[in-house]
Amino acid sequence: MQLHLSASCWLPSVAAVRVYYFHRTVRCGDCLRIDQMSSETLKETFHQELTDGHLEWRPTNLDLPENTHFMFDYDLNANELVVVRDDGKQPVFNKLPEVWELVYHPAKFCSMLIDLVREQLAQPN
């Protein structure tokens, strides 16, 4: 699902693409597994992009007061993995609810995340 945001509900960033894993303070085993698989996939596949600042990985605790706005910014229902493309004009975000179905299928999980991040990184600024 791809949604557009108004410019008023995003935070400026050097990175053109940000990957968020939104979670709560108390997390189940599957929540921790999604966080771990996402982190490892991004670090292994996009090391250079993370290093040079074109990509950011942001696990974010929604229970912290400073992060509650994300619930509205990205229309979050629960713990979610979200890829945000920020061209400086109109941020676009993709929620990945299918991670819950793929949590025990690491190859498919990683492939889905890699494909979406590559697609977003390939977009012109």
Question: In which residue ranges do the predicted regions lie?
Answer:
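N-terminal targeting signals for export/organelle localization
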Residues: 1-5
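N-terminal leader/targeting and pre-domain segments
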Residues: 9-15, 119-125
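Thiol-based oxidoreductase modules, predominantly thioredoxin-like and allied folds used
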Residues: 50-66
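Structural micro-motif
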Residues: 66, 71-86, 90-92
